[in-house]
């Protein structure tokens, strides 16, 4: 079987595809292997899905190549845009179902998935649908007897590997620009969270995409992901995930056909609060900056720096605010923070909490498992940290942050940049000059002022340093999926002789 019946409080019973999506069909894996998908709230098995191996990757790539070399290559930009817009419409129509499935295997709050993730995914698809017929070349005049034009062409077959923290959102971030520019896709989901991607594949069928244009597989990174990054017939690989895996993908891409690479990787982002900031607003955004999505965000504001004049007041207020975050059942109406995605992530985060204690940092609040079932962790704040501590330098990827004090603007710029990462940062201040000076000085791809995590599909997102290569979202993301061709036509007589 390539589907099962599932049920959630918001949807009732529904049909959940479990097969690999290749050539517009849900199919079994060649080797017939499956693996279990776990509900992080209950630690129970939701269902089993097909497990792709190298053989399945080959089949999916062949389907994508056939589609790229076939009618899809001749599809008009207008029609590509219409397909993406139709898909966006279907996302909105099926928002409850997509959000419920996200809550089921990812553990994020249903309310958050419905009100944030799904609308943002639909918005992203619609945005790139609008770009499809606006990708233009140009004519360059070099001489009277020469006609030169520059074309923007699709790269070809694109491999895309997405993470488990924002399954449907990352699906859209990857699919949107690739399809708008005329490519075909083989996308691998994270093994922890495959279900919403397969719901989206049903919508691909309904929207009318031709076979082979979008192929989605589930499998493990060491097998299916490795096969994709080393595949000789994949022209480009895009990956969102850890810096460690990003390095491996770069090596595989270089060692195979030197495929083009886009990487959106880890972060350890500074969230800076100056003494002149609106305290209530700053506390709201600092709380949202770290605890949104259970701290499972690459851009999470996990290093909080507060100017010393307001440090004591801020930390007391922030502790009180963090303790108010409702942690629990993703399907409960008031839940803000659900469980971590897996036992592995739960153990990893608890390990960092223990490391913080051993290194001499002080737990201001949290630090414990919440309940005895599910991968729930209390919102946790560490103080009395030093810049060389692991909890200050390494990405924890959970509801854990550190808070430190600083004296001057120059001091906080220096320590804010004291990281191998450079994905995001924030500055909270009522002084526009301070905001601009600090934002310009921070080595980060995105800097928010008096807010946090306010991403938008129109704005480029990506990192400096070890936080990645290339940019997602905005017009900038289109560059990841196009090649530039120069055509030069000689006019008139022979140039020499």
Swiss-Prot record:
Subcellular location: Cytoplasm
Pathway, per record: Alcohol metabolism; ethanol degradation; acetate from ethanol: step 2/2
Binding residues for NAD(+): 241-246
UniProt KW Chloroplast keyword: no
Gene Ontology cellular-component terms listed: cytoplasm
GO BP annotations, alphabetical order: ethanol catabolic process
EC annotation from Swiss-Prot or TrEMBL: 1.2.1.3
PANTHER family: ALDEHYDE DEHYDROGENASE-RELATED
Protein name: Aldehyde dehydrogenase
Gene name of the encoded protein: ALTA10
């Amino acid at each position: 079987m390539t589907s099962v019946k599932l049920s959630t409080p918001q949807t009732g019973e529904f049909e959940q595809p479990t097969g690999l999506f290749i050539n517009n069909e849900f199919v079994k894996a060649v080797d017939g292997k499956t693996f279990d998908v776990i509900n992080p709230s209950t630690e129970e098995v939701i269902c089993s899905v097909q497990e792709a191996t190298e053989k399945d990757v080959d089949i999916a790539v062949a389907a994508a190549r056939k589609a790229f070399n076939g009618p899809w290559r001749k599809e008009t930009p207008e029609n590509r845009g219409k397909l993406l817009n139709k898909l966006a419409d279907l996302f909105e129509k099926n928002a409850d179902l997509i959000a419920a499935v996200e809550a089921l295997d990812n553990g994020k709050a249903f309310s958050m998935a419905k009100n944030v993730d799904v609308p943002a995914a639909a918005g992203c698809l619609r945005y790139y649908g609008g770009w499809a017929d606006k990708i233009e070349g140009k004519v360059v005049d070099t001489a009277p007897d020469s006609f030169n034009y520059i074309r923007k062409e699709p790269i070809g077959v694109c491999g895309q590997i997405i993470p488990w923290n924002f399954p449907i959102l990352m699906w859209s971030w990857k699919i949107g620009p690739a399809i708008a520019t005329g490519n075909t896709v083989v996308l691998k989901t994270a093994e922890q969270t495959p279900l919403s991607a397969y719901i989206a594949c049903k919508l691909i069928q309904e929207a009318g995409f031709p076979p082979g244009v979008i192929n989605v597989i589930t499998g493990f990174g060491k097998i299916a992901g490795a096969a994709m990054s080393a595949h000789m017939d994949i022209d480009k690989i895009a990956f969102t995930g850890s810096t460690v895996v990003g390095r491996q993908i770069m090596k595989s891409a270089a060692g195979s056909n030197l495929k083009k690479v886009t990487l959106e990787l880890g972060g350890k982002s500074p969230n800076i609060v100056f003494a002149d900031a609106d305290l209530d607003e700053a506390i709201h955004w600092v709380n949202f900056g770290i605890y949104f999505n259970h701290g499972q965000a690459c851009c999470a504001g996990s290093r909080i720096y507060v100017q010393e004049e307001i440090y004591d007041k801020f930390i007391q207020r922030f502790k009180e605010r963090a303790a108010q975050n409702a942690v629990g059942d993703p399907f409960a109406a008031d839940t803000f923070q659900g469980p971590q995605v897996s036992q592995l992530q739960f153990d990893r985060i608890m390990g960092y909490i223990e490391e913080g204690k051993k290194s001499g940092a002080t737990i201001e609040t949290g630090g414990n498992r919440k309940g005895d079932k599910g991968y729930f962790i209390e919102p946790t704040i560490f103080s009395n940290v030093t810049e060389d501590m692991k909890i200050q330098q390494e990405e924890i990827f959970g509801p854990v942050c550190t808070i430190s004090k600083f004296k001057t603007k120059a001091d906080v710029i220096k320590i804010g940049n004291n990281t191998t990462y450079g994905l995001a940062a924030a500055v909270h201040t009522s002084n526009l000059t301070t905001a601009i000076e600090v934002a310009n000085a921070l080595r980060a791809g995105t800097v928010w002022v008096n807010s946090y995590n306010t991403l938008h599909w129109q704005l480029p997102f990506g990192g400096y340093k070890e936080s990645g290569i290339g940019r997602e979202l905005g017009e900038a993301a289109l560059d990841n999926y196009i090649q530039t061709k120069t055509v030069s036509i000689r006019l008139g007589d022979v140039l020499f002789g």
